[in-house]
Amino acid sequence: MSITHLLIDIEGTTCPVSFVSEVLFPYAKQSLSSYLNDHQEDLDLKNILQEAEREWDGDPSPDSIKLRQATRNQNLNFIDSIKVYFEYLINVDRKSTALKDLQGKIWDNGYRKGEITSHLFNETTECLKRWHRRQLSLSVYSSGSIQAQKLLYRHTNDGDLEHLFDHWFDTHTGNKKECASYRKIATKISTNPSEILFISDNGEECDAAGASGMETLFSLRDGNPDQSPRSHRVIKTLNDVDEYL
């Protein structure tokens, strides 16, 4: 079967890892305390904080359990207590859905204030537009929240690219390293997995997508943490993707 859908990762695939690690993550960490204090009455934030509390209650990590007990011993209020957990999640680089949702809210605030602009790889915009013109369906699957994904493409150095994508998936769909997540995506977009090409800079994610029946491409670039493509076909620029369509 021919490829009709592209399922595309973000970090290390369409934008440099450095933009996420040196701009987005530090901005969210720096703004965490003030955002929680300023928006604690917002319903969306309350829902995120409740989810974080559920995650914390079920977190088996010894360090997390110690933190939980320490905050109780200090009689911290809810906001100050949950902030401690978010800071812990950030420091251990946990792929927490509640944290990702909160970061999306903080980044939304930053984009709106003009304090953040997304930086993509030089060829990304033209490649996305070219594939869109070819009537390929473009979807995003990233560990960042769907809100964060849309913000990133809405506020790029090349303008608003959000309209080029048909579907958005994050960790609410499932872990990116689990085959079931990709099967769920194929079902969601009503497409045979063999017609979907997944592009990522992570070998384990490519393994999981491949196990679901999807075609895969491994994004191998300087600066990407994972430099081992395993058995997956390699691209060094998004322009290389066309060879496999």
UniProtKB/Swiss-Prot annotation:
Record's keyword terms, sorted: Amino-acid biosynthesis, Hydrolase, Magnesium, Metal-binding, Methionine biosynthesis
Top EC category: hydrolase
GO biological process, one term: L-methionine salvage from methylthioadenosine
Catalytic activity line of the entry: 5-methylsulfanyl-2,3-dioxopentyl phosphate + H2O = 1,2-dihydroxy-5-(methylsulfanyl)pent-1-en-3-one + phosphate
Co-factor: note: Binds 1 Mg(2+) ion per subunit.
UniProt keyword Metal-binding present: yes
Keyword Amino-acid biosynthesis: yes
The protein's assembly and partners: Monomer.
Similarity comment text for this entry: Belongs to the HAD-like hydrolase superfamily. MasA/MtnC family.
Listed name of the protein: Enolase-phosphatase E1
